[in-house]
Amino acid sequence: MRQTKIGILLANLGTPDAPTPEAVKRYLKQFLSDRRVVDTSRLLWWPLLRGVILPLRSPRVAKLYASVWMEGGSPLMVYSRQQQQALAQRLPETPVALGMSYGSPSLESAVDELLAEHVDHIVVLPLYPQFSCSTVGAVWDELARILARKRSIPGISFIRDYADNHDYINALANSVRASFAKHGEPDLLLLSYHGIPQRYADEGDDYPQRCRTTTRELASALGMAPEKVMMTFQSRFGREPWLMPYTDETLKMLGEKGVGHIQVMCPGFAADCLETLEEIAEQNREVFLGAGGKKYEYIPALNATPEHIEMMANLVAAYR
């Protein structure tokens, strides 16, 4: 009997192809049209999206992307490609494809790439450590849509999340320790996760619980007292309430209260991107220092570090 051939699909959110208003507009249109991301009535949402949000937001966001753009593309794309290549080197007999929910390379192109390698079974690893319907759910939906058009489909293993995975927590902890060794131990370690509307959590999305799990496990691995670690949520969009406390408001409050030294990590981001490099490392640094804080460091995402790649290899090992 022929041995089953396994392929790995690394999935992430996506990125514009260029730091231009036109490219950002195309990307945001696809992203903000997904009901998993914005579930508002289409009769209300389409005119607002096309008539107000895209024309006004695209030029501003393009400037932000330009401020962090790298030689090989957006940071998310550069680091995601590095992750794909490093994992392929770690698992030389296993094809590894990269697909994005929005933009290029698409999830469909990633599936087709693996099928062209004659794989019988695809292990899907969404690079979102904490499940949310708006991220992991979107990957699931798109994968189902893609496979629904195939006459023959491969076996599928779908990794829901890895919020409390031992290798993941250890990699985060080692990254924090390295930052403490370099910059000194701060008064507070702030863990900033991407937010979602509070309503999504009220309706059953267990994302906040998964974030709390990671926070608890990381604090335990570091041996830090609970009062020395704080969890917040960033990147809110629109007018409805999102998960709280908000990162920017918390940093302002901490600076005003006399907290002098803060280090910030974003455990929910597997790769550095606009939201970490610009929003957290730059914007929120200014918020904290402007409110009276003295010292602020951003701890980079795990990106393509050896520990992160080893974690990915171990995650998919059960399916190989």
From Swiss-Prot:
Cellular component, GO annotation: cytoplasm
SUPFAM superfamilies for this protein: Chelatase
Keyword list, A-Z: Cytoplasm, Heme biosynthesis, Iron, Lyase, Metal-binding, Porphyrin biosynthesis
Alphabetized GO MF terms: ferrochelatase activity; metal ion binding
Biological or metabolic pathway of the protein: Porphyrin-containing compound metabolism; protoheme biosynthesis; protoheme from protoporphyrin-IX: step 1/1
A Pfam match: Ferrochelatase
Family as reported in the entry's similarity comment: Belongs to the ferrochelatase family.
Protein name: Ferrochelatase
Organism of origin: Shigella sonnei (strain Ss046)
